């Protein structure tokens, strides 16, 4: 591939890297994955990565494993409010959920650690168009309401650029283009190669 998933894995120190990964001013390139989560990075991997044999509620609690505060229950309630289908299925095994519900669960679980940076790897993969639209509207709302930064890896360039402030085009592991989402959407080369124009 182009290296999009590898980029997310490198940020989380899940693969060998050279150079530095900075979160703000802090070098996190040698930190353990649990420390990276504590520092404010949450990763929703491609394929959702829920724990199918655990309940929806147990999956959410795993997302808060690095937290020691007393507000975990409040956050569970908050994500149940934002994703009401999860609340309806809180005792149900994650493996029995639909693809869209599993993706909502994976996102809510990642948000349980109260990240500063949310990494989303192909969040639309295998989902029906209406589910994708709903999910991306929720991402946009979450960003506007909380200021949460999201790094979204997405094959659907139109979808990604519609919600993005800034975009990167990666080919063969190299950043070949970058700029504001608006600039990229209006670039004739991007339109021809990636947007089907």
Model-predicted regions and their roles:
Residues 1-197:
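Glycine-rich phosphate-binding loops of nucleotide-dependent enzymes
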């Amino acid at each position: 591939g182009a290296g999009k998933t590898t980029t997310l894995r490198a940020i989380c120190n899940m693969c060998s890297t050279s150079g530095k990964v900075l979160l703000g001013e802090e070098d996190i390139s040698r930190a353990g994955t649990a420390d990276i989560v504590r520092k404010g990075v949450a990763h929703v991997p491609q394929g959702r990565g829920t724990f199918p044999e655990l309940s929806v509620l147990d999956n959410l609690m795993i997302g808060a494993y690095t937290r020691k505060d007393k507000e975990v229950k409040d956050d569970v309630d908050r994500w149940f409010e934002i994703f009401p289908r999860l609340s309806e299925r809180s005792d149900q095994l994650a493996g029995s959920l639909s693809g869209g519900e599993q993706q909502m669960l994976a996102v809510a679980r990642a948000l349980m650690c109260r990240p500063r940076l949310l990494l989303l790897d192909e969040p639309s993969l295998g989902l029906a168009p209406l589910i994708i639209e709903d999910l991306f509207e929720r991402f946009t709302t979450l960003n506007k309401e909380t200021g949460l930064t999201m790094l979204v890896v997405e094959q659907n360039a139109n979808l990604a650029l519609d919600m993005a402030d800034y975009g990167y085009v990666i080919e063969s592991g190299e950043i070949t283009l970058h700029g504001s989402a608006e600039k990229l959407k209006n670039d004739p080369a991007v339109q021809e190669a990636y947007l089907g124009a």
